[in-house]
């Protein structure tokens, strides 16, 4: 995209691609022949990183994206770092809606240790929390249950586990990955974000 006017000329061609291996945006440049002086590359990267902080769907940070600066144009007099930063903003705003972005939610790996008599209650509870049972192991009258559950579903879990097991259950959790939100939930969050922005 280009920003025009006296003292503000910058033109960039940026390719955006999924990058599931990295949460933070990965920036590369593949500009050949001096179409853009190297001194402007950091401004393009900064502009893109600023945009990634607030996604287009509901304002959440954009993750798992690789941005590659492929080409562009500059002007000896009218180009500046600010012009290339603004051009990066425009490229992002133009490309992101076309990329079919989705909302993601953090998934945690949960390990629960409970007396065997509570296993059915725990499994039923995990099902209500949109959890996936990954494994179970019985040891000394205790069931070790491993599940992966959306973090949003784990609020107040310590209190609820204590109530379900009469204080005899324990658990640990750690971040595992991000997964796409179910469509109905995603639509609700996007609608709420639009409503909040209009207020």
Please give the residue ranges for each predicted region.
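Accessory interaction regions appended to the cores of large information-processing enzymes
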Residues: 1-199
């Amino acid at each position: 995209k280009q920003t025009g006017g006296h003292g503000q000329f910058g033109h960039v061609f940026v390719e955006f691609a999924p990058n599931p291996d990295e949460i933070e945006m990965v920036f590369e440049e593949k500009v050949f022949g001096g179409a853009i002086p190297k001194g402007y590359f950091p401004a393009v990267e900064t502009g893109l990183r600023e945009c990634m902080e607030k996604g287009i769907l509901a304002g959440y940070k954009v993750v798992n994206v690789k941005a590659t600066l492929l080409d562009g144009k500059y002007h000896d007099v009218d180009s500046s770092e600010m012009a290339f930063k603004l051009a990066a903003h425009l490229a992002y705003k133009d490309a992101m809606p076309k990329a079919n972005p989705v909302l993601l939610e953090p998934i945690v790996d949960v390990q629960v240790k409970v007396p065997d008599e509570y296993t059915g209650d725990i499994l039923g509870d995990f099902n209500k929390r949109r959890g996936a049972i990954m494994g179970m192991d019985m040891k000394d009258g205790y069931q070790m249950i491993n599940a992966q559950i959306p973090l949003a579903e784990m609020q107040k879990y310590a209190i609820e586990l204590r109530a379900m097991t009469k204080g005899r259950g324990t658990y640990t959790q750690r971040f595992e990955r991000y997964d796409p939100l179910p469509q109905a939930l995603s639509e609700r969050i996007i609608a709420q974000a639009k409503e909040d922005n209009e207020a």
